[in-house]
Amino acid sequence: MRPSGRAADALRSISLTRHYTRHAEGSVLCAFGDTKVLCTASVLAKVPPHKKGSGEGWVTAEYGMLPRATHTRSDREAARGKQTGRTQEIQRLIGRAMRSVFDLAALGEYTVHLDCDVLQADGGTRTAAITGAFVAAHDAVSTMLRDGLIAASPIRDHVAAVSVGMVDGVPVLDLDYAEDSSCDTDMNVVMTGSGGFVEVQGTAEGAPFSRADLDAMTRLAEAGIARLVQHQREALGLA
């Protein structure tokens, strides 16, 4: 039995609350159980230097955790004067995930800048950030269409993410902190709505995992992401 009482293939309770803040072109509070991430999408009328004059836009992300998002307080990275390697890794992952489903030429020379701030962490913050950031980005694009900044949506597909792992030899979906801190294998999977893999990050924390374990975990992730995409569609009124 999992600590939460969930079945091995069960997601936590998922919610995607749109228009959570007032000023951003897109904002979503994404909750995976007790993990809560505020995802905002801002439209900027500029692009990074490597895109200037190309006619293409850019999608990028920043990620951070509030000081008391975890069991004990941690200093703000701004107070320490630099980002941790973990923060840099996660925000690059979010950016790659979003760009995988954007047609940058259709975006024009605009940047969609995503800010993902963890309000409360109970495992799976990066997967919640990706899943919520897509909905925020979708709302930002809708704002651009409404305001006549672009002629057609640059979004080609949905993208979402979930964690999977091996706990006592059993593949489980959407690990919370208790499972994440004690599992033998921890894996994060990012996929598109059409079933394409964007990223697979897997590490054996204890016993090495077999090819059969890998296949079982990716199948579990695929099924979980299909359900997350359905949550996105329902939140956006597309279901």
From Swiss-Prot:
Pfam families reported for this sequence: RNase_PH, RNase_PH_C
Protein's UniProt keywords contain Nucleotidyltransferase: yes
GO molecular function ontology, one term from the record: 3'-5'-RNA exonuclease activity
Keywords assigned: Nucleotidyltransferase, RNA-binding, rRNA processing, Transferase, tRNA processing, tRNA-binding
InterPro entries, per database record: ExoRNase_PH_dom1, ExoRNase_PH_dom2, ExoRNase_PH_dom2_sf, PNPase/RNase_PH_dom_sf, Ribosomal_Su5_D2-typ_SF, RNase_PH, RNase_PH_bac-type, RNase_PH_CS
E.C. no: 2.7.7.56
Catalysed reactions listed for this entry: tRNA(n+1) + phosphate = tRNA(n) + a ribonucleoside 5'-diphosphate
GO BP annotations listed: rRNA catabolic process; rRNA processing; tRNA processing
Binding positions (phosphate): 86, 124-126
Entry keyword ATP-binding: no
Function per UniProt: Phosphorolytic 3'-5' exoribonuclease that plays an important role in tRNA 3'-end maturation. Removes nucleotide residues following the 3'-CCA terminus of tRNAs; can also add nucleotides to the ends of RNA molecules by using nucleoside diphosphates as substrates, but this may not be physiologically important. Probably plays a role in initiation of 16S rRNA degradation (leading to ribosome degradation) during starvation.
Subunit and interaction comment: Homohexameric ring arranged as a trimer of dimers.
Sequence similarity: Belongs to the RNase PH family.
Name of protein: Ribonuclease PH
Organism listed in the record: Cupriavidus necator (strain ATCC 17699 / DSM 428 / KCTC 22496 / NCIMB 10442 / H16 / Stanier 337)
